Amino acid sequence: MNFSNDSEEKVFNEIFDQLPTLIKDKCSDYDELYGYKLNYNDSKEKLVEQYYDEDIAKALIFKICKAYQFDKTKIITSIVDILNWRKSFNPLSAAYKETHNEALQTVGLLTSYPDDEPNKRVVTWNLYGQIVKKKELFKDSSKFIRYRIGLMERGLRLLDFNNDANNYMTQVHDYKGVSMFRLDSEIKACTKQVIAIFQKYYPELLYAKYFVNVPSILSWMYDLMKSFIDEQTRKKFVVLNDGNKLGNYLKSCPSENYGGTDKKNNLQKQDVDTPRPTPYALYILESQANEDID
């Protein structure tokens, strides 16, 4: 963690000291963030002993502090909102427990490039050319949203929050095959909801976002995303009309369609298997399963 000044460090320490009280009083004791335990003062001491990692907990809280420029009031509000949302939405279930429509597997993919530049090693791909072919999937927006959040959570599992070279994700939005279509209102509504969720509940996790094969007809999409985000995030956006130029930015991406160095595998073959949840995430999922049985 790198603080710009003593004031930032003071705010961080105050927030971290308040964390157990916030979790107890404002979050119904729910303390899981991206699969990691936050409450170092849990009354269930065995849980702290088994699952608490102070370095990771501090790294995650630091990210939220950084996202809100060390504004204490905003940080507290964000922590409470995030934990309460996670308790109600249950993104761990979306990532590891639920069975999603098989067709969605062609819409969103996850790749891992351990030898690439810092923070370009975990990449989520959104293939809008596939989306327009499967508009029926968006009749029930909640199903797509749960799938997309699940994909995000699985990507987070591949990050190392103690490693500055791999504690952010990169995203690719590919619009190949969309030039002759306009995304209909249901797809737009889903997109808008997902953007809002990422902005509010996943702060300071995006390193870069590449928009590739973007036809002028879809300029609304880029404008929509810009309207939801702050200036710092907008600086992370790169628009490429030619998808084959992506290899200049993500060297390990497939040579096919994207101009990367991997000539053996296309994007579908690069798609990684579902990673194993963190030990604490497994504990929570097992506890939920036992409650369901009861």
Swiss-Prot record:
Q: What is its main location?
A: cytoplasm
Task: Give membrane topology per the record.
Answer: Peripheral membrane protein
- A single GO cellular-component term on record: cortical endoplasmic reticulum
- Needed co-factor(s): heme b
> Which residues hold heme?
128, 148, 173, 175, 209
Q: Which CDD domains match?
A: SEC14
Superkingdom, according to UniProt? Eukaryota
Give the location in the cell: Cytoplasm; Endoplasmic reticulum membrane; Microsome membrane
InterPro entries in the record? CRAL-TRIO_dom, CRAL-TRIO_dom_sf, Sfh5
Catalytic activity field = a 1,2-diacyl-sn-glycero-3-phospho-(1D-myo-inositol)(in) = a 1,2-diacyl-sn-glycero-3-phospho-(1D-myo-inositol)(out)
Q: What's a BP term from Gene Ontology annotated to this protein?
A: regulation of establishment of cell polarity
A GO molecular-function annotation: heme binding
The UniProt function text for this chain reads: Non-classical phosphatidylinositol (PtdIns) transfer protein (PITP), which exhibits PtdIns-binding/transfer activity in the absence of detectable PtdCho-binding/transfer activity. Regulates PtdIns(4,5)P2 homeostasis at the plasma membrane. Heme-binding protein that may play a role in organic oxidant-induced stress responses.
Q: Which family does it belong to?
A: Belongs to the SFH5 family.
What is the protein name stated in its UniProt record? Phosphatidylinositol transfer protein SFH5
Native source species: Vanderwaltozyma polyspora (strain ATCC 22028 / DSM 70294 / BCRC 21397 / CBS 2163 / NBRC 10782 / NRRL Y-8283 / UCD 57-17)
Encoding gene per record: SFH5
